[in-house]
Structures are given as structure tokens and as C-alpha cells.
Amino acid sequence: MYVRHLGLRDFRSWAHADLELGPGRTVFVGPNGFGKTNIIEALWYSATLGSHRVGTDAPLIRAGADRAVISTIVVNDGRECAVDLEIAAGRANKARLNRSPVRSTREVIGVLRAVLFAPEDLALVRGDPADRRRYLDDLATLRRPTIAGVRADYDKVLRQRTALLKSVSGARFRGDRGALDTLDVWDSRLAQHGAELMAARIDLVRLLAPEVEKAYQLLAPESRSAAIAYRASMDAFVAADDAAPDRVALEEGLLAALAARRDAELERGVCLVGPHRDDLELRLGDQPAKGFASHGESWSMAVALRLAAFALLRADGSEPVLLLDDVFAELDAARRTALARVAESAEQVLVTAAVLEDIPSGWDARKVHIDLRDSADGRVSAVQS
């Protein structure tokens, strides 16, 4: 798989761009702040419908514009597929697949399968559980695009149940049985959709675990062994290492946990149980990586998580595109060499770098120099001619 064409309209610092790409390695070179990362961000958005830098779409639209457009042509096994995404301010986003409108933007997920390495990856180890949940959910969705619908259904139920919790927090004292019966209905829906999302995550962690261990050993052979595990918000939940998750058991466990925590939830007006409270536990030896790993070990773990994702996507039978956003500058020589070795085997690698010296020596790569220019639209990014 590779991206043959990337078009941008009013995306971040790019008023207009049409980039012809191909298999092999392409390096986007330019000073920081000139718009290199925006290219990688656009490709990642096309793959996942989300940015790796911000949680909302508004910052993606260039100042003064009312929408941004990302257009890609992806080649997979000789077949071309065109995806156009319109990111709108204050209204629903739109998508077209092979120039035909689709009902939901989620229908384009899976056309471009990519793995992103970025400086923000350190948050996978040192950041909040939300960063690790997003890593799992993005990868699960790339492997099985229907997971996007599962995530959307769960998020919708979670919002509605949380709103109900806030509105009925005093119902048990007023004896309002009707309000509590309504909460029972939302408990059932949350457990149903939550169990489906948890099952997808747990199965993914089961497949990722040996790949993470192997990748970490490659990156840091002198360090402690690495391990990952799924940690649920349900008390006493332990995911089996070698068995597919039981969705029925997960649903029953969620219902029991919701019943046990209801008083606390009514007191606080928040949902305390469910996959939105779960975490991916990262361990080095017998210690958690967060808080105990050195800076180098943290980077090795973060890169190992991305390498494991690359291995899984490749094993699924479709070569993912590698997106490397200024990551070589963050790594020492050994980790840089290990990552470069993996990148050499990929069908397409798209890299950003502030200076060419950040790129591994001996790399045969096309160089695209990025500039920042004054125009009628203000200062905009441009490709040097």
C-alpha cells in the first residue's frame, strides 16, 4: 500500500498543496514551524479521522477559512482508491469515496492503513490512560473498521448516561423510582456496547503483547524485558493471555460493577465504570514503565508499541504506510538504527526532518523541501520548486 497523491486545501498552514508521492522513502525537509508535520497529520487524519496533536477538528482549518479538505489517492495491490475529506467549522464533516459521497465519514476508514511515529508518542508511556486507550482504539479501528461504529455507539451512550446521572443525582433521596428505572436501561446499553469495545481491545492486547516484547528487545537488548496487559475498571478483572475475550462475561461483569458503584456515581454525577476508565498497563521487569522507566527506556517502549502495531497490520496482509514525524531526532544512535532497519522493509515511508543530518546515513530517499511564504492569504506553507 502507498499514497500516490495528497491534496490539501486550507489545512493548517497549507492554503493549497498537490503532492505526487510514490513507493519508497520520501523526506520532507524544512525548519520547524514550516508545515512539515501538517502533511503527516493530514495523512494520519485520512487514516483514522483524528489528529495525533489535537482532540478537536477546529485547529485543522486554516485561519480565515471555513473548511479544510484532505484528498488522497491510495494504491493497494494495484487498485486505486480516492478519498476526499471535508473538515467543516460548525457543521458535520463530509467524505467522498472514489468521488461519490458516503453517508458517514467512518466509511473511508481502512482505505489508508498507516502507522505513525511522532514526538508525542512519549505520552504513551508517561501520559494519561486516555493516550494509551486512543492508541488501542486507533489500531483496532485500522484493523477492523467496524470498530469505529462501536466506539461511536459507546461514546454516545456514555454521554447520555452521564447526563442522566447528573440530572437524577438526588432521585434516590426523593424516591423517584422512574428516574432510577431509566438509569437501569442505560446501564444495560452501556454494558452491551462497553463489552464489545473491551473485547476488541483485549483481543488486540493479546496479539500485541509478544510483538511489543520482541520489538523492545530489539531496541534495548540490555534493558529489562517489556510486557503489556489490559487493566479494566471492573474490580478483580483479569484478561486471559491466550484466550479470546468472552463478551457475555464482560457484559455481565460491567452490569455487576455498575450496580456496585451506583451510589458513588449518583453522588458524583459521573460514570465510574466502563472502557472509558480502562488502561493499557506497560511494564519493564517487575515495575510499571510510567514513573520508573528512564527517558531512554520510555522512548524504547513507545517505539516498541508502534513497531508492534506495524507488525500486526503487516500480518493482516496489507502493508501499512509508515509515517515518521521528526522522530529520528528524538532517538539515540541504537534506536535510530533499529527503527531505520524496519523502515527499510516498508513499501512507503514518509518522513519529516528539520535537517537532513537527522536522517539515517545511507538512506536512498527523495527529498522535498518545505518553505514558508508570504501570500495574499498570509504566511502559508509551500513546496520549494
UniProtKB/Swiss-Prot annotation:
Signal peptide: none
Binding site for ATP: 30-37
Species this protein is from: Mycobacterium ulcerans (strain Agy99)
Compartments where located: Cytoplasm
Cystine residue pairs: none
Domain of life: Bacteria
NCBIfam families (UniProt xref): recf (TIGR00611)
Cited InterPro entries: DNA-binding_RecF, DNA-binding_RecF_CS, P-loop_NTPase, RecF/RecN/SMC_N, RecF_2
Name by which UniProt lists this protein: DNA replication and repair protein RecF
Gene3D superfamilies in the cross-refs: P-loop containing nucleotide triphosphate hydrolases, RecF/RecN/SMC, N-terminal domain
Role played: The RecF protein is involved in DNA metabolism; it is required for DNA replication and normal SOS inducibility. RecF binds preferentially to single-stranded, linear DNA. It also seems to bind ATP.
Alphabetized HAMAP family for the sequence: RecF
GO cellular component, one term: cytoplasm
Gene Ontology BP terms: DNA replication; DNA synthesis involved in DNA repair; double-strand break repair; SOS response
Keywords from the UniProt entry: ATP-binding, Cytoplasm, DNA damage, DNA repair, DNA replication, DNA-binding, Nucleotide-binding, SOS response
GO function term, MF aspect, one: single-stranded DNA binding
UniProt similarity note: Belongs to the RecF family.
